[in-house]
Amino acid sequence: MNIDGIPTRTLRAHPDRRAIDIIDQTRLPHALHWVRVATLEEAAHAIRAMQVRGAPLIGATAAYGLAIALDFEASDRRLAEAVALLGATRPTAVNLHWALARMENILRPLAPEARCDAAWAEAAAIAEEDVAQNAAIGQHGLKLWNDLIVADGQTLNIMTHCNAGWLATVDWGTALSPVYAAHDAGVPVHVWVSETRPRNQGLLTAWELEQHGVPHTLIADNAAGLLMRNGKVDAVIVGADRIAANGDVANKVGTYLKALACADNGIPFYVAAPRSTLDFACPEGASIPIEERDGDEFRLVHGLDSRGVPSALRQLPAGEDVANPAFDVTPNWLVKAIITERGVCPASRDGLLALYPEEARG
């Protein structure tokens, strides 16, 4: 996608294959800052601190982090330590574990001296596959938008939650890929952007939509139901951090409430995700671990002060107890359809297996 009109991806590997550069998303939308990741520990920190976030981008970053780790030492012990460290950073995002398992399955049988080159090649393949899959999701989603248009020149009002755009992937995004596809095809589209407290990832969505020229409006999370009730929303689309085998969806906390509001107002609720987000080994949403993050994300508000200096302000009295779950689970019956790189399917085991019959072996 574009930043100031320049095609840009969220991460880039150095030609010497010793490091990667990532966008520090904790500094957006106020500053675009690139960070060099040159050690295993830096890669783990980038994922844990949400300098990179979004399940597909987490997976790609972890793959490169493993390649970086093997630059220093490629022994069996180093491989196991790197997989364990990276795998513990974000428990809900299944793309992380998918990418690490894929890397380890390829690297483990190789002699240590062959692992470094193979690791960098496989990490690059994971990144390129992510771009292609997300572009395909966009085209499948565009067909759904066309079905919603009932009058020439009608503006489609799409609501989203959190950030599942290109900042959450290597490029294109998942939930926003159909939005970009529609905009680029000349379909009038407007996006209601939910702020997504407490980390306000909706600001990232608004920032990237602005970069691409897509009309949008930022809203408070609690305004979503009112907009639906007043007929101002044609569809809701979100990404996912993990989709269970039965079609239950783990996504940013607050997703479940939007799905409930959609059901009450007859609005289709779509989930967009690539194969790497599908966890066929997880039978249902109740089996998905829910990450609990530091309460200071809730206690503190980050922004720029009157001088334009980044600042953090405490909004709660000292010692106030808070709960800060990062995700919730939306049951499959609230999901109109799941959009993947292979097509659109019902949110059910049968629906997913129709697109991925090779998984029926399990």
Curated annotation (Swiss-Prot):
Keywords of the record: Amino-acid biosynthesis, Isomerase, Methionine biosynthesis
Q: Which InterPro entries match?
A: IF-2B-related, IF-M1Pi, IF_2B-like_C, Initiation_fac_2B_a/b/d, M1Pi_N, NagB/RpiA_transferase-like
- State what protein this is by name: Methylthioribose-1-phosphate isomerase
Annotated residues that bind substrate are located at R53, G54, A55, R90, Q201, N251, K252
Question: For site (Transition state stabilizer), what residue positions does UniProt give?
Answer: C162
**Catalytic activity reported:** 5-(methylsulfanyl)-alpha-D-ribose 1-phosphate = 5-(methylsulfanyl)-D-ribulose 1-phosphate
Q: Which HAMAP family match?
A: Salvage_MtnA
The cross-references to SUPFAM superfamilies, in alphabetical order and at most eight, read: NagB/RpiA/CoA transferase-like (SSF100950)
One GO molecular function term of this record is: S-methyl-5-thioribose-1-phosphate isomerase activity
**Metabolic or biological pathway:** Amino-acid biosynthesis; L-methionine biosynthesis via salvage pathway; L-methionine from S-methyl-5-thio-alpha-D-ribose 1-phosphate: step 1/6
Active-site feature positions: D241 (proton donor)
Q: Name one Pfam family in it.
A: IF-2B
Q: What does this protein do?
A: Catalyzes the interconversion of methylthioribose-1-phosphate (MTR-1-P) into methylthioribulose-1-phosphate (MTRu-1-P).
Going by the record, the broad EC class of this enzyme is isomerase
EC nos: 5.3.1.23
Q: Which GO biological-process labels does this protein carry?
A: L-methionine salvage from methylthioadenosine
Q: PANTHER family, per this entry?
A: METHYLTHIORIBOSE-1-PHOSPHATE ISOMERASE (PTHR43475:SF1)
Family affiliation: Belongs to the eIF-2B alpha/beta/delta subunits family. MtnA subfamily.
> Organism, per UniProt?
Dechloromonas aromatica (strain RCB)
